[in-house]
Amino acid sequence: MAAVSMSVVLRQTLWRRRAVAVAALSVSRVPTRSLRTSTWRLAQDQTQDTQLITVDEKLDITTLTGVPEEHIKTRKVRIFVPARNNMQSGVNNTKKWKMEFDTRERWENPLMGWASTADPLSNMVLTXSTKEDAVSFAEKNGWSYDIEERKVPKPKSKSYGANFSWNKRTRVSTK
């Protein structure tokens, strides 16, 4: 009986030590501040009185962008929906409207043979979720624009048997 009670007492003491160690470990893992930094800053900002500034007239932001004026006033933007990729059957690439700038003068680099340009906007393609968003962005930046409307493909109705028609050139002879 003494051996049984000894093992029970030993188990209880070991269990208590383990519980104390786990409690100390879990206390050390508790962060000192439960809010993340950005959440804490938002909470601090909300305590102060905030007022929104509304402007009734449309502001011209072209002077604030830092782009030279010859690249702003004479730019033409093409707004379009890109064509579907032929390598896949999905329409993933055709949901967004793209804005592409016109190409300006390019020349060949005499050292490397690369195509060079002095136009900072020529290789930039902007994306917008709707046509109206793209148009408003172009107007806000002072760019003239052309819109290519979305081309909706007409489904061609044909039967499966048309693939095996005897008078159509669907099967090519190997001879």
Swiss-Prot record:
Transmembrane segments: none annotated. Keywords: Electron transport, Membrane, Mitochondrion, Mitochondrion inner membrane, Respiratory chain, Transit peptide, Transport. One of its GO terms (cellular component) is respiratory chain complex I. Residues 149-175 are annotated as: Disordered. Mammalian complex I is composed of 45 different subunits. This is a component of the iron-sulfur (IP) fragment of the enzyme. Interacts with BCAP31 and TOMM40; the interaction mediates its translocation to the mitochondria; the interaction with BCAP31 is direct. Belongs to the complex I NDUFS4 subunit family. This is NADH dehydrogenase [ubiquinone] iron-sulfur protein 4, mitochondrial. It comes from Pan troglodytes (Chimpanzee).
